[in-house]
Amino acid sequence: STDHVVDELERSLKDALDVVTAALDAGGVVAGAGAIEIEIADQIRDEAAGIEGRKQLAVEAFADAVDVLPRTLAENTGMDPIDALVDLRAEHDAGTTAGLISEGQTGIIADPIEYGVLDPAAVKREAVESATEASTMIVRIDDVIASN
């Protein structure tokens, strides 16, 4: 009935507004579509260049792990993941915001902000913090095992 449709529409609108409010209260939004992950991975790789020995390899491996989301997005949109990552890095090196946008049956590299593909900053921050904690624990466990 019409009343049911209106009620459902009101609930959906309220849910959408709650999501927006939560995102803004928690520090806003960041570009989605893997754009922020590419930038984070690039920053990690830049830092890795100044680290010597095995630690550098561990830091680079962490950067590779951060690239998993854009790589998966590329695969899911039918793009070659290696070519997509190379192109994304080139765009970011040129100073543009670029992500993997699903357009119909294919994927394109474009500015996710222009396409309205945004992620809550708090969610991304929490994901990076959790991944960092997990990586640190793995390295510590590996050090303990290696010392025995």
Please provide the spans of the model-predicted regions.
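Extended, low-charge hydrophobic alpha-helical regions
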Residues: 2-148
